[in-house]
């Protein structure tokens, strides 16, 4: 019997007929990818290939990346994705016959200096999220380094359960069908900085207040983790962008309600090579940020 079953976001191949060829590139439904790139030209990310062959040759855009030995019917291959369309081919040979599987995706290499167009960042997250409607990819946060982009200060928001912590909140966020953008956050963030070139940028800030006085039923995909209720926090903070105040006393829960998506857009000119800095100041409790999107207008 040969079968395929879905586990999380990957395909696990179950094979009991060893003589039948099995070959499958994982995550083929992920059509829009992105990642931080030091040169703006390529970004290396792992890609799993499932097969019952002893080895598999992997190609990127027609060029061989090498032949990889297979262990326990799976091999993880580091793919140097390039900007634009990427075609990945996996090839095995069984009894003199060649078998091939193919994966095609669009990739955005995020680099603030070379060809920067946009960056979409999930704060408090170490996961990716594909927005298929908008055809874009949200990438994990990183700490700021000179010449790049990232957060300054704060810590990942805890998502506590009776059995430990979840990597993200399980809350159903009101006002959006893109819950993963709002289910993680950085608490106590001081700033988000991007050393982008001079120009005009649209800056989108994404918030939701994940603490609430209301007990909500766990979502189906919570799988009975018994989330520990976090009490409501009266959170007030200020926001300024490149020295210009855009909010003096922002209270997300008071103004919009808890567990509700809030998106604010600002048009920001960048000049004199100073880059882009969004600063957060505590008024009561500590600031939060769930996600940020920076798009170059011109």
Describe the residue ranges of each PLM region.
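Compositionally biased, intrinsically disordered or flexible polar/acidic segments
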Residues: 108-298
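Surface-exposed, short loops/turns at beta-strand junctions within beta-sandwich domains
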Residues: 78-85, 270-272
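Short, exposed coil/turn segments at beta-strand boundaries within extracellular/luminal domains
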Residues: 94-104, 286
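Single conserved hydrophobic/aromatic residue that forms the stacking wall/gate
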Residues: 1-8, 12-13
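Surface beta-strand/loop "capping" patches
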Residues: 15-53, 111-117
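Short, aromatic- and glycine-rich surface loops/edge beta-strands on solvent-exposed regions
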Residues: 85-94, 276-281
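Short beta-strand segments within Ig-like beta-sandwich modules, predominantly Fibronectin type-III
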Residues: 64-73
């Amino acid at each position: 019997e040969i079968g395929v079953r879905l586990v999380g976001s990957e395909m696990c191949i179950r094979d009991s007929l060893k003589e039948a060829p099995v070959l499958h590139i994982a995550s083929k439904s992920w059509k829009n990818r992105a990642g931080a790139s030091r040169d703006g030209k390529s970004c290396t990310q792992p890609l799993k290939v499932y097969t019952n062959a002893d080895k598999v040759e992997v190609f990127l855009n027609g060029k061989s990346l090498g032949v990889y030995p297979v262990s326990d019917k799976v091999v993880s291959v580091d793919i140097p994705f390039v900007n634009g369309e990427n075609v990945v081919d996996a090839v095995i040979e069984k009894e003199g016959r060649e078998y091939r599987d193919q994966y095609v995706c669009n990739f955005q290499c995020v680099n603030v200096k070379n060809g920067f167009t946009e960056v979409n960042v999930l704060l408090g997250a170490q996961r990716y999220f594909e927005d298929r409607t908008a055809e874009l990819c949200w990438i994990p946060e990183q700490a700021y380094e000179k010449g790049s982009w990232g957060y300054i200060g704060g810590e990942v928001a805890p998502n506590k359960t009776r059995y430990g912590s979840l990597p993200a909140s399980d809350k159903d966020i009101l006002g959006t069908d893109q819950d993963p953008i709002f289910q993680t956050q950085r608490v106590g963030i001081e700033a988000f900085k991007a050393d982008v070139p001079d120009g005009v940028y649209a800056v989108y800030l994404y918030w939701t207040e994940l603490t609430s006085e209301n007990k909500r039923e766990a979502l189906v995909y919570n799988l009975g983790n018994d989330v520990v209720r976090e009490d409501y926090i009266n959170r007030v903070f200020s926001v300024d962008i490149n020295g210009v105040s855009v909010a003096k006393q922002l209270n997300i829960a008071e103004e919009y309600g808890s567990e509700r998506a809030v998106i604010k857009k600002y048009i920001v000119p960048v000049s004199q090579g100073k880059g882009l800095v969004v600063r957060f100041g505590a008024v009561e409790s500590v600031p939060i940020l769930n996600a940020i999107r920076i798009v170059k207008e011109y």
